[in-house]
Amino acid sequence: DFYELFLDDAVEAAKLLDITLTTRGQMDGVPIKMAGVPFHAAEQYLARLVKIGKSVAVCEQVGEVGASKGPVERKVVRIVTPGTLTDAAFLEDKETNRIAAVNADKKHVAIAWASLQSGEFKTKLTTADKLADELARLQAAEILLPEGKSLPDGFQATSANITRLNSWQFAADAGAKLLTEYFGCQDLHGFGLDLSLIDI
């Protein structure tokens, strides 16, 4: 069994992973480019892609072969990004893999970070002039930013990968709702979080 990539994804993966690029079938008379990795070795290839800053969506077959005409139904079952890699086999010894998010309003800059390995998550309000130092201390593998926002000039994101998301994904009320639903609680005071602040 293989995990397969097609079209531009196949071309890029073949180059990055040094795997064979081939073709399967045609689309509008043009051969469809394809590359693949063995199922048993997929995690190693996945880790290599993530370590160089790529995000990977893993799809699995969910339909029965031959149950209907056309391709077998597939669904995304896992998304792995630089900040969400948790397998200890692919992390350096004692390395804590963190994902961080940065947002700002007129008064504060908020940082939220988490380690999916340990389940730890924290937030902090700081100022623009201290943000670069805070991010350097965290050594996050991935930093989430709202579209149109940038990190301070003094911060060199050499070890972190920047992922830009829609601004609405940084709304404090939406963050509070997600967290209270996830933890099954009325509010987040027990976690030291104030719903009125942007660090949620």
Region roles according to the model:
Residues 1-198:
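Basic, polar low-complexity surface loops/patches
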